[in-house]
Amino acid sequence: MGLPDGSDQGTHQTQALLSAAQEMELQRRDYHVERPLLNQEQLEDLGHWGPAAKTHQWRTWFRCSRARAHSLLLQHVPVLGWLPRYPVREWLLGDLLSGLSVAIMQLPQGLAYALLAGLPPMFGLYSSFYPVFIYFLFGTSRHISVGTFAVMSVMVGSVTESLTADKAFVQGLNATADDARVQVAYTLSFLVGLFQVGLGLVHFGFVVTYLSEPLVRSYTTAASVQVLVSQLKYVFGIKLSSHSGPLSVIYTVLEVCAQLPETVPGTVVTAIVAGVALVLVKLLNEKLHRRLPLPIPGELLTLIGATGISYGVKLNDRFKVDVVGNITTGLIPPVAPKTELFATLVGNAFAIAVVGFAIAISLGKIFALRHGYRVDSNQELVALGLSNLIGGFFQCFPVSCSMSRSLVQESTGGNTQVAGAVSSLFILLIIVKLGELFRDLPKAVLAAVIIVNLKGMMKQFSDICSLWKANRVDLLIWLVTFVATILLNLDIGLAVSIVFSLLLVVVRMQLPHYSVLGQVPDTDIYRDVAEYSGAKEVPGVKVFRSSATLYFANAELYSDSLKEKCGVDVDRLITQKKKRIKKQEMKLKRMKKAKKSQKQDASSKISSVSVNVNTNLEDVKSNDVEGSEAKVHQGEELQDVVSSNQEDAKAPTMTSLKSLGLPQPGFHSLILDLSTLSFVDTVCIKSLKNIFRDFREIEVEVYIAACYSPVVAQLEAGHFFDESITKQHVFASVHDAVTFALSHRKSVPKSPVLATKL
């Protein structure tokens, strides 16, 4: 037995030594790359670059064929694709149990959220039936539970309360206040569905990407606070005035505080008992969720128990506890939306449409990622829109999906929207036969159901701490969205938060991180010298990079930051150079003027000398020596004038910084790393051309590196390249540009071998 143990120990030691040797080998492993130095022209030739072939997608869209029609049908009615292939044995039992569990939650939430929307409870059941069945036909998510949702209900409630508070508005509809609220709600649902279907058909599902996660979470948190405030009147049993618009939450809280002496004790006790019972059941479900096949239906049991106690004890008569009252049974015929309300509701409808879709698609993507399938955002928009659009004809109010019900649908074995269809059929049974049994249900119990279900959204206050550590800008978005939604109401708050979020995007694009790059030793990698102490600037070469793309909003800032990082006051140096050149030119002009005057004097002297042909021989002879001396002297003066003119013509213009007595930059080449550019506009092109011009004025050659082909094509289309700036100034990488700048300063680009040791 000892021998095998020793051999095993030796084997383990050998394996450990081998793994250590392999690790050291990996750490020492180098590779050697040898390739030509490539500028853009050479790269295009080597890679056979050419514009991508244009695909006429519109031809495919408008092509008529049986296959195309079948594909469109399956795309827009997904149930026809997956239902024929539904694995009954594997999934049906789970979907049935899941649908029953969701329906048990859907019933109390539908009744409660109808009150939240300012409507009779029965309309909450309608909104839990029609839209759910429509989504079963057109939706692509297998797990989300469509129906009433607190945030949507409070948004609808704010609209119904604000409009019906005006007596003239109610009289204009020729209806009671309750009927007017119903008309506003189902007309609003029709408009919301119209917006969602229209946006989905034109593939505007990407719009929701502009609603960041901090914005959506903050908005739903603020909405949950408004939900909580709106339920205080049912908890305390007090009558409140209708407040709408900015600061309505503040006014409501102040009025609740003023009305506290009129609290109905029986209502408060009922709400507290129901709330405690719901919390205990939820805690029990969380603790025993692994042992229980289905969660305990705490909400349904609470509603049944509260209804029985209220009926037996006569809470309404003896303790003045408000109850739901008469609930009509049976389905109601469809009605047309009130077209005269369209202009009044269009703004609120668009806000509700965006929020509802944002919540639905975010939950849908979470479950799709968890279970490995794909959710089509555009089809989801159409499906949710049809749910609201058709629901509007059957007097439903706008719906979305609920996180709590969706989690129950997933955790209880739901695999497809068959679970949703089962839950809608169960709700149909309640509507047709059992709805009237809940007429003695206390409204305080429904308020307790709503408040307890806000637990998940109230937990989102913890985002403040996590965002403080992770990203202060996202925290700012969260806080601004929350405050704006609380103070300005849901519709204006959403608009303010979206505008603020987009404004922050613009500001962050205008304030990118600018850096000077240095080479990491023995590599072709270049990093920010301020962050990497081992990265060293290449002598004579300055490499500059921005963390954001360059466009009209930050082009000037890019140019200013470049000059600042280079440590050279380019504008001042150019101004001084121009002044020195102008001064030199003025000096040359003065010299030319002086020489010109000398020339004129000499010419006058030459022209004054003449020979009189009539002089006698004796005069000529006597003046021969004298005349020859004068001619020699005059010839010398003429030669001086000619030579001075030639010197003026050949005098060089001294324009270099050194000859002008100006300081020279500490580098001879500037490389712009444009790897972060995703597009360019005309302002960007003009800014880059100005950079080339200005730095060449101070004797610094400029190169571009790591520019993607689409951006190069845009530069070419914008007439960036000309005789002075060619594609030979654009290089495949920063290292190519650095190598060229060091070895080919102010020369025609060639193709030396670039050897890089890594």
From Swiss-Prot:
Question: Its biological function?
Answer: Apical membrane anion-exchanger with wide epithelial distribution that plays a role as a component of the pH buffering system for maintaining acid-base homeostasis. Acts as a versatile DIDS-sensitive inorganic and organic anion transporter that mediates the uptake of monovalent anions like chloride, bicarbonate, formate and hydroxyl ion and divalent anions like sulfate and oxalate. Functions in multiple exchange modes involving pairs of these anions, which include chloride-bicarbonate, chloride-oxalate, oxalate-formate, oxalate-sulfate and chloride-formate exchange.
Q: Which residues form a coiled coil?
A: none
Q: Where is the PTM Phosphoserine found along the chain?
A: 751
According to UniProt, the name of this protein is: Solute carrier family 26 member 6
Keyword flag Phosphoprotein: yes
Q: Which residues are glycosylated?
A: 174
Keywords, alphabetical: Anion exchange, Antiport, Cell membrane, Chloride, Chloride channel, Cytoplasmic vesicle, Endoplasmic reticulum, Glycoprotein, Ion channel, Ion transport, Membrane, Microsome, Phosphoprotein, Transmembrane, Transmembrane helix, Transport
Picking any one GO biological process from the record gives: protein kinase C signaling
Tissue spec. comment: Expressed in kidney (at protein level). Expressed in spermatogenic cells. Expressed in intestine, kidney, testis, brain, muscle, heart, and stomach. Expressed in the submandibular and sublingual salivary glands.
Topological domains, Cytoplasmic? 1-117, 209-263, 314-340, 402-417, 507-758
Q: Which Pfam families match?
A: STAS (PF01740), Sulfate_transp (PF00916)
Q: How does it assemble?
A: Interacts (via C-terminal domain) with PDZK1 (via C-terminal PDZ domain); the interaction induces chloride and oxalate exchange transport. Interacts with CFTR, SLC26A3 and NHERF1. Interacts with AHCYL1; the interaction increases SLC26A6 activity.
The record's listing under NCBIfam families reads:
sulP
Which spans are transmembrane here? 118-138, 188-208, 264-284, 293-313, 341-361, 381-401, 418-438, 486-506
Q: Which InterPro entries match?
A: S04_transporter_CS, SLC26A/SulP_dom, SLC26A/SulP_fam, STAS_dom, STAS_dom_sf
Instruction: Note how its activity is modulated.
Output: Apical membrane chloride-bicarbonate exchange activity of the pancreatic duct is inhibited by 4,4'-diisothiocyanatostilbene-2,2'-disulfonic acid (DIDS). Oxalate secretion in the duodenum and chloride-formate exchange activity is inhibited by DIDS.
**GO MF annotations, alphabetized:** bicarbonate transmembrane transporter activity; chloride channel activity; chloride transmembrane transporter activity; chloride:bicarbonate antiporter activity; efflux transmembrane transporter activity; formate transmembrane transporter activity; oxalate transmembrane transporter activity; PDZ domain binding
User: What does the UniProt entry report for the null mutant?
Assistant: Mice show an important decrease in salt absorption in the intestine and failed to develop hypertension on a high-fructose diet. Show a reduction in pancreatic duct fluid and bicarbonate secretion. Show enhanced oxalate absorption in the intestine leading to hyperoxalemia and hyperoxaluria with high incidence of calcium-oxalate stones formation.
* Residues on Extracellular side: 139-187, 285-292, 362-380, 439-485
- Limits of the STAS domain: 531-741
Highest taxon listed in the record's lineage: Eukaryota
Question: Its induction, per UniProt?
Answer: Up-regulated by dietary fructose intake (at protein level).
Q: How does it sit in the membrane?
A: Multi-pass membrane protein
